[in-house]
Amino acid sequence: GKVIQVLTMDNDKMLNADGVEDETVGQQWLETHNNWPAQMWIQTSYNTRNNKHGSGDDSKAFRGNYAGIGYIWDEDNQIFWPKKPYASWVKNTTDARWQSPIGDAPALTAEQEAQNQANTNNWTYNWNESGQSWDLTDTLA
């Protein structure tokens, strides 16, 4: 389903009788206080992006990405997905991100990186949907 609202909730409002965080407890609380069916509330983690946790402990990563309005909930993969950037891009479920059909953009050369740092050039790769390729451009040229 499509994310239409994101609410924050203290984790202590989600504790069950054993003191363990439990999504169903949070769903019941939200249903009571927001008058929407419990099953419409799906927990997300503010600290998770691209299946990585902000603390550096990726075992804490939860549901791929922090949900945002317009994101799509993928129940099969347990991931919140942002809008697909290009029609040809595919789901990379390992990193919870969209990826071009030919993979990530090539790395810039050391010379290009040095030119970017010196602000003499601004080399970047941009996805070319019609050509299905990464095009290198200098945005300062």
PLM regions: where:
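Interaction-interface detector
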Residues: 1-141
